[in-house]
Amino acid sequence: MTLLSTLRGISSPARQQPGTQSESRRGGDTLAERGLAVAGVSHGFDGTAVLESVTLAVDRGETVAIIGPSGTGKTTLLRLLALFSEPDDGTIGLDGTDVWRQSERQRLAARRRIGMVFQKANLFDTTVRRNVRYGLSVRRSWRERLRSWLGGRKRQESVFEALDIVGLADAASQSASSLSGGEAQRVAFARALAYDPDFLLLDEPTSDLDPRNTAVIEEAVDAARSRGLGVAVATHDMHQARRIADRIVVLLDGQVIEAGPTERVFSDPDDARARKFINGELVY
């Protein structure tokens, strides 16, 4: 049974214990032996530092919300977690393995285990169904594509299951160009889910959506997490972060200034700057 076929109507399992740690291969920070992680990561553009010595891990079966002011590095951190580029310093690991010390083929295999939904949905001018199926085509290895081609019915089932999760199964034959912005974002979410990734990264996924579409996305996030995906969400919406996240990471000026269980961070943060940000008192 696939992940997608069991996402709906399943209660959340007990939280997994945090992964153990091993030494990073590039620095003194530790790299989680389970899940998707960064250890001591720094990164910048054109000589300007964006992230400085960031360490965090996303384990399977949990949702981590990354919050902080605009321009503080949330999107850059997600893109590094998605393995879009190599960090200037530090380690990016998948289940304890330094991905950027692997071969290109191994990195491609690792990248296929990670789905990402951007702030703005980028859909093709074709049907909703074909947009979702595109994720299956580009993310799977040639062996997986061959098996999928030989089992076309299973491939179609994956597409419709993903669309059903976001409430758009009835729109499968509809042109993507006719969708509202919220519906397009839901299609992008379905596309990321269709190939059953281990980890899902969301960059401000509901920033421009109405309450109904926001609720659908949040329900889909919770369903994915409840069935074992590790989810990381960058959001400026404090209420959303508190609703959907198991853990909170607060970024300020490219550094993690606070991290911990959601209720503890919101009710009693250790860092004074994090407290001011959460209370809306930080002038930035």
Swiss-Prot record:
GO terms for cellular component: plasma membrane. Its main location: membrane. SUPFAM superfamilies: P-loop containing nucleoside triphosphate hydrolases. Disulfide bonds: none annotated. The keyword Oxidoreductase does not apply. SMART domains: AAA. Residues 1-22 have a biased composition (Polar residues). It comes from Natronomonas pharaonis (strain ATCC 35678 / DSM 2160 / CIP 103997 / JCM 8858 / NBRC 14720 / NCIMB 2260 / Gabara). Its EC number is 7.3.2.1. One of its GO terms (molecular function) is ATPase-coupled phosphate ion transmembrane transporter activity. It is an enzyme of class 7 (translocase). InterPro entries: AAA+_ATPase (IPR003593), ABC_transporter-like_ATP-bd (IPR003439), ABC_transporter-like_CS (IPR017871), P-loop_NTPase (IPR027417), PstB-like (IPR005670). The gene is pstB2. Keywords: ATP-binding, Cell membrane, Membrane, Nucleotide-binding, Phosphate transport, Translocase, Transport. PROSITE patterns: ABC_TRANSPORTER_1, ABC_TRANSPORTER_2, PSTB. It holds the Pfam family ABC_tran. This is Phosphate import ATP-binding protein PstB 2. Gene3D superfamilies: P-loop containing nucleotide triphosphate hydrolases. CDD domains: ABC_PstB_phosphate_transporter.
